[in-house]
Amino acid sequence: MSDNKVNLPLRNGVGIVVLNKDNKVFVAKRIDNQKNFWQMPQGGVDKGEDYLTAAYRELEEETSIKNVELIKECDGLISYELPKNLLGIIWKGKYRGQEQKWFIMRFLGQDNEIDIKTKHPEFSEWKWIDLENITDLVVDFKLHVYKDVKEKVKEILN
């Protein structure tokens, strides 16, 4: 592990905005965080995997959600950097942050299909919230990502 943040690469990742029929956004509380931080499903891209495949895989791995339709693949990539206190802890110290491709999807199923008690659970609870509130619940170092994503979703909904 390098102590020099600049020398560490960004991890390729995906993020998924899941909207229900009422245009509420799926968020979940991380199991490894004592504070009241919530996030949308997200995760890394495996070697040889394209972004969309990674998005579907991460969504199912974290939430058991399969019944979705793709609304939009957002343009560009959005990156965030880990704060110093998390370097060397998250992702085994291999990355300084994540560069993400975001997708907006519509959940077509019923709430009882959502199960966060997966093989490797990441979340302790989940809920649907208004789009306007997604920036109120996120950890500070991802705030700019969620602001950007919120604007992209607003463009779709308006």
From Swiss-Prot:
<dbReference type="InterPro" id="IPR022927">
    <property type="entry name" value="RppH"/>
</dbReference>
<dbReference type="Pfam" id="PF00293">
    <property type="entry name" value="NUDIX"/>
</dbReference>
<feature type="short sequence motif" description="Nudix box">
    <location>
        <begin position="43"/>
        <end position="64"/>
    </location>
</feature>
<protein>
    <recommendedName>
        <fullName>RNA pyrophosphohydrolase</fullName>
        <ecNumber>3.6.1.-</ecNumber>
    </recommendedName>
</protein>
<comment type="similarity">
    <text>Belongs to the Nudix hydrolase family. RppH subfamily.</text>
</comment>
<dbReference type="GO" id="GO:0008893">
    <property type="term" value="F:guanosine-3',5'-bis(diphosphate) 3'-diphosphatase activity"/>
</dbReference>
<dbReference type="GO" id="GO:0034432">
    <property type="term" value="F:bis(5'-adenosyl)-pentaphosphatase activity"/>
</dbReference>
<dbReference type="InterPro" id="IPR000086">
    <property type="entry name" value="NUDIX_hydrolase_dom"/>
</dbReference>
<dbReference type="GO" id="GO:0019693">
    <property type="term" value="P:ribose phosphate metabolic process"/>
</dbReference>
<feature type="domain" description="Nudix hydrolase">
    <location>
        <begin position="9"/>
        <end position="151"/>
    </location>
</feature>
<comment type="function">
    <text>Accelerates the degradation of transcripts by removing pyrophosphate from the 5'-end of triphosphorylated RNA, leading to a more labile monophosphorylated state that can stimulate subsequent ribonuclease cleavage.</text>
</comment>
<dbReference type="InterPro" id="IPR015797">
    <property type="entry name" value="NUDIX_hydrolase-like_dom_sf"/>
</dbReference>
<keyword id="KW-0378">Hydrolase</keyword>
<dbReference type="GO" id="GO:0006753">
    <property type="term" value="P:nucleoside phosphate metabolic process"/>
</dbReference>
